[in-house]
Amino acid sequence: MLWLRRLFARNRPRNAHAVEVWQWNRIESLWADLCYAVRILSKSPGFTAVAVASLALAIGANTTIFSYANQVLFVRLGVPHPEQLRVFRLTGDDHIAVREIKGHDVYVSDDGHFRLGLFPYPAYQQLRHNNRVVEDIFAFMQPPDVDITAAGMSEVGKVEFVSGNFYTQMQVKPQLGRPIEAADDGTPGGGAVAVISDSFWHRDFGGTQDVIGKTIRVNLTPVTIIGVNPPNFSGPVAADTSAPEIFLPLSMLTTVFPDPTGILMAPNTLLLQLMARSKPSVSTAAAQASLDTSFNAAFRGTAIVNKGETVPRLSLEDGSRGITSGTRDLLQPLYIVLGLAGLVLLLACANIANLMLARASLRQREMSIRMALGAGKVRILRQVLTESLLLSAMGGAAGLVLGYTSRNLIPWLMRTAWDGGEMNVGFDWRVFGFTCAVTLITGIVFGIAPAWRSSRAEINTALKEGSQTSSKRRKAWSGKMIVGFQAALSTLLVISAIFFLRTLLNLNSVDPGFRTQHLLLLDVTPSPTLLDTASQVARLRSRVADAFATIPGVQEVTYANHSLGDANSDWRSPFQREGALQDLAADPKKTGHAYAMFSYVGPHFFSTMSIPILAGRGFNAQDTETAVPVSVVNQALVRKFFPNTNPIGKRFFGGYGTRLIVGVCADTRYSDMRQPTPPVHFDLDPQSPWPGQMTYIIRSPLRPAALVPSLRRAVQLIDPDLPLSNIRTQQ
């Protein structure tokens, strides 16, 4: 930028007094340029308003999108030295020795391997005991939503179970009270204490200082509040749409979620997420190698590894932003949207540059007179750039306000009209710096062409009569270049919009495999501590379904442990068809066990969802709790596990036990409309021990707003403490 250097370095004086005078004159000159720019722009209010509005919209859109991208991609955990944190992960193939996965931190990488962020509890204990290469390993897990009763009010919320060293290793101190300590996590069921979030403290207790020592109930289990987290601490996930409201000791897990079968603590069940702080003296590669060896020994020493099964490999990842698996699918769309927003900003700059060029041609005589009176080209250049920067500053200020007020727009657009959860997008120094940088660059970009044109005015020619036509001819090349640039950008944006619209139309035309119209979904979470047996859970669910079915306007009712098409539904378990163990013994490399998705569904599921049964039958009245456990499988599962074979009457092991296949249903989308249908088996819920949250699916032509009050009353008549939440439509 040689011209900028000349702008401030020309005729620089050499002695101290002259330097002081020169600096003061320079400030006066800049101030005069600014005042003149204000007067010039105020004389053209229409032009100024159009330019500022265009810049405000473009900069505001970029600020809004960058605010969301900053929250998802760059914001670190609100803990001291987050760069020291490491997240533990597992990598495995179809033959890993895992029986159950309790969580959603699972995906398939590009190389076809499973990437898991979950660990068995017994292996964690061994790994922590043998660790020498990182600071103390801490564990945590977020279970399904729970029923929280506080200050006499019942609600559905999220909790996080944490190990006794969680707060010590996170280096977080509560703003009130004390944290969860090792003594609270020593004995199963013995640490009935809780640390609550700052938002929960203010919402349910009004932010009063006497909250310490008060009792709340989590799934009807009383716990005593011992601390309140700092406002900037949301747990182990930085950009979470639903941060935990209550933190409990890990020892309380089987009390809040009774586990008579011992599945939660089973050595082959993936349950916990792990993190640790790195040691300065040990590299990440060396720590990973040592921990992988230790985990292999710990897993083989605690879990069951059959012939042909493999132990997953352990790896360490950056944990400064906490658990980021939930944002993995957002990366590519975010980068695309950021690029498109940048193109819109460039287009706005080109538009204003064209307007400025048009104004420059009309001001040729003015500039020529100023140059004839002694103004140098640098002074003219600086004056026009000052006007451009003033315009960009006004547009940037308006864009900053627009970006701040609409910073939560993207999360709001991503949630349904009935879903109350939302991400609180921060507005930190990165966003402010980004907006200031964009404003400065914008002013230079759209101002440099008019400034350069104005500084090259020919005095004699411009002062002659008719010089305006001549100047128009001489400026034509720059105007045509900008118009061409605008046309190119506009074409690119139009093509991008066409592709985007085509993608939306394609997604809208994808057949999900069931009828999505007139389906209302809502979640009901019974307390597992109140319902001691699976039969009690089944009876409660039947009562709720029967109550919903009697409401006028309701055509059919069913329920499932999650809704089809839910992006957060990733329920999978090992799948072994009947005879697979014999095949595995004969040739370990031939079969092994693969994974299949599964859903626990209620009676009338297939008729309510309008999913056709292609072979066999659906569920009927003979499929009681004491009858043989049955399942309906989809076509994708038949193609993978029963090729060229009739699956009806065959048995398989998956989910919570052995089941009999009684029917084959059509393929439906499971969790992603863009992905092929995975193998899925639908298990009858009354025959399963699943005690957690259920999604009720109601088919009705009535508007949701008209139906919801009746649904709430029906639930309250059964149990006033039974929470109803997350109301949304299937579409």
Residues of each region from the PLM?
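Short, strongly hydrophobic transmembrane alpha-helices
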Residues: 45-72, 76, 81, 347-349, ...
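Conserved beta-strand->loop/alpha-helix structural units within folded catalytic cores of enzymes
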Residues: 43-58, 62-65, 215-218, 278, ...
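N-terminal membrane-entry
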Residues: 326-343, 430-434
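Membrane-proximal extracellular/periplasmic loop immediately following the first transmembrane helix
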Residues: 77-144, 268-273, 511-577
